[in-house]
Amino acid sequence: MPDNRQPRNRQPRIRSGNEPRSAPAMEPDGRGAWAHSRAALDRLEKLLRCSRCTNILREPVCLGGCEHIFCSNCVSDCIGTGCPVCYTPAWIQDLKINRQLDSMIQLCSKLRNLLHDNELSDLKEDKPRKSLFNDAGNKKNSIKMWFSPRSKKVRYVVSKASVQTQPAIKKDASAQQDSYEFVSPSPPADVSERAKKASARSGKKQKKKTLAEINQKWNLEAEKEDGEFDSKEESKQKLVSFCSQPSVISSPQINGEIDLLASGSLTESECFGSLTEVSLPLAEQIESPDTKSRNEVVTPEKVCKNYLTSKKSLPLENNGKRGHHNRLSSPISKRCRTSILSTSGDFVKQTVPSENIPLPECSSPPSCKRKVGGTSGRKNSNMSDEFISLSPGTPPSTLSSSSYRRVMSSPSAMKLLPNMAVKRNHRGETLLHIASIKGDIPSVEYLLQNGSDPNVKDHAGWTPLHEACNHGHLKVVELLLQHKALVNTTGYQNDSPLHDAAKNGHVDIVKLLLSYGASRNAVNIFGLRPVDYTDDESMKSLLLLPEKNESSSASHCSVMNTGQRRDGPLVLIGSGLSSEQQKMLSELAVILKAKKYTEFDSTVTHVVVPGDAVQSTLKCMLGILNGCWILKFEWVKACLRRKVCEQEEKYEIPEGPRRSRLNREQLLPKLFDGCYFYLWGTFKHHPKDNLIKLVTAGGGQILSRKPKPDSDVTQTINTVAYHARPDSDQRFCTQYIIYEDLCNYHPERVRQGKVWKAPSSWFIDCVMSFELLPLDS
């Protein structure tokens, strides 16, 4: 092989045609140290450019039909149509954000800061992200919104505006034929007056006004003579559209507030003007009109009608959900995470009541919403503009603004906050989930202070604490733990927050979790502890320390206030009670405004037994497996004496029922999680149907075929039973053959690897004590 390391003053020899072309030498980008590295970084950044705007990619997305990669803002007008470069058709659900490429761009930004000693990079990682539709400066009309005060309906339409900017407006007379400016010198109070006049003639067809009349009404000539507006004056934008490219003009605004609840119907221009620069990327009712519909003027009545009939929603962008099956090694890509759609823009207060618009964006505090449509729409028909809804594009900096505090101090706004805070996207994520993923500390703090549940789980089982530990947001983890987040709760595949922190090497978070009582010996579905996922010696030294006071840690994790436990309705049921005791229980249900069932249901919260010991009835066992309160009948008497709901702890049956309740409050897996049962033979003492109900209620699964102990497929299953003792071989046994032991026939003993035979009495004892008891010979 030829030596390519030649001095610069020596001419390279002629390359043979059979030899491969050598790589070009890196030319230094400048003088000084790291010149070759800077040159290589420049070449890398040339490859990381958008295929449309040729700038460095920001939130890179792929339309799915081709290999071109764009900035998310550059293709907001191409969603659902096709690639703007090769014109390949692309479905809207194929839109994907390349999180790995985005991480590479952030690393390039850090490297450039190191090489150039520049702290102000345009790729700075901490710069707030922009969503797919929030570029209000470059694409002011990307989203149109219509609102009807009568029907209380809102519709959003995505405009397919051209990427090319329009030419500047000429001041000569000939330019007036192409573009027009309509400036209103009147204060915003006139808008409400015009809206009232418009409502009186909403049923009549409005006459078309000539251009001269409109110019005269809007006082265009006078404004041009007076000159430009004062740049210091706050202004809002009004949009008057005569064609597919509407003109945007400005008019004064008072206190930066926008009121849309003027009585009567609003004209198209007023609706547009009051709702500019409001970005709602996650709205369910988003349509992309075709070319024909863009050239026609749509009235609010027509829009509201279409809104009622149209139920097609825009699929939510893959906003950082971990994959349920493919778990990679990197902390972000292991859960198939992609960036979150975020909103930005100026702080706008609007009074648009919309129920079908989820707001799973947490880069900003949530907005208070009113429910509309159906009964709630009729009840709120007389609502005034004091019901304020914050824009989802509110940046965290507005948390301390006076206008924000004024809005959130209103009782109506705070009353509607919980309904909005529990909104979920199609992955089951709440606002708190996404704020924890993004590390948005102001939004997390705001949501927690206003009653958001820190222990809510998404469809995969992840809590906000899991997400914060996975992404390494130490401050978010601290906030969640301070607001009673459960430190040992399990997520997908029974991973605890400590598992996530250990996998990704977040030592500070591991220390914080351990200080709050995180269990070092917690195992996931594969039987692996947090220490099994790390190679770092310092982290191993933390995770290998013995748990000195495990009982206190468990009690620390199980602390939940009474109000949090009693959020839901009380559902009472009695087991083994006499007729007189049943009457007293019915009286208590009336006093406490609770429900009383005769058959067990998954909604039951309290099971009342006559004595001090729990009975092996089906109701009691189902109550134990579901984590219900198993109470003595003295609790009913105490509640009847004081006419209030007494504290349950003093009247709770100890041992198994208490362990079951604490297990449920800590959101831990059920008793038979990871176990499979085959019911062999006939059952007389406990019918087979009852055993099936118990297995299902305990999180186990029923096998339709008898497992074979000598089967390689059976023995190679790598899952474990969560509640089995970690120091016994029973933890690896996941398949049980249950038989009736009260009869004279006893089958041969099987205890081979994953398959064990066990009597039905052992199964019942496990339920009553809520633990997997040792299986004696």
From Swiss-Prot:
GO terms for cellular component: BRCA1-A complex; BRCA1-B complex; BRCA1-BARD1 complex; BRCA1-C complex; cytoplasm; cytoplasmic ribonucleoprotein granule; nuclear speck; nuclear ubiquitin ligase complex. GO terms for molecular function: histone H2AK127 ubiquitin ligase activity; histone H2AK129 ubiquitin ligase activity; kinase binding; protein heterodimerization activity; protein homodimerization activity; RNA binding; ubiquitin-modified histone reader activity; ubiquitin-protein transferase activity. Residues 1-32, 167-211, 356-404 are annotated as: Disordered. Residues 26-119 are annotated as: Interaction with BRCA1. The modification Phosphoserine is found at residues 186, 391. ANK repeats lie at residues 427-459, 460-492, 493-525, 526-546. A zinc finger (RING-type) spans 50-87. Processed during apoptosis. The homodimer is more susceptible to proteolytic cleavage than the BARD1/BRCA1 heterodimer. Transmembrane segments: none annotated. GO terms for biological process: cellular response to ionizing radiation; chromatin remodeling; DNA damage response; DNA repair; DNA strand resection involved in replication fork processing; homologous recombination; mitotic G2/M transition checkpoint; negative regulation of apoptotic process. Homo- and heterodimer. Heterodimer (RING-type zinc finger) with BRCA1. Heterodimer (via ANK repeats and BRCT domains) with CSTF1/CSTF-50. Component of the BRCA1-A complex, at least composed of the BRCA1, BARD1, UIMC1/RAP80, ABRAXAS1, BRCC3/BRCC36, BABAM2 and BABAM1/NBA1. Interacts with UBXN1. It comes from the Eukaryota. Pathway: Protein modification; protein ubiquitination. Keywords: ANK repeat, DNA damage, DNA repair, Isopeptide bond, Metal-binding, Nucleus, Phosphoprotein, Repeat, Transferase, Ubl conjugation, Ubl conjugation pathway, Zinc, Zinc-finger. Residues 389-404 have a biased composition (Low complexity). SMART domains: ANK, BRCT. This is BRCA1-associated RING domain protein 1. There is a cross-link at residues 160, 170, 423, 548 (Glycyl lysine isopeptide (Lys-Gly) (interchain with G-Cter in SUMO2)). E3 ubiquitin-protein ligase. The BRCA1-BARD1 heterodimer specifically mediates the formation of 'Lys-6'-linked polyubiquitin chains and coordinates a diverse range of cellular pathways such as DNA damage repair, ubiquitination and transcriptional regulation to maintain genomic stability. Plays a central role in the control of the cell cycle in response to DNA damage. Acts by mediating ubiquitin E3 ligase activity that is required for its tumor suppressor function. Also forms a heterodimer with CSTF1/CSTF-50 to modulate mRNA processing and RNAP II stability by inhibiting pre-mRNA 3' cleavage. Residues 197-209 have a biased composition (Basic residues). It is an enzyme of class 2 (transferase). Residues 560-653, 667-777 form the BRCT domain. It is found in: Nucleus.
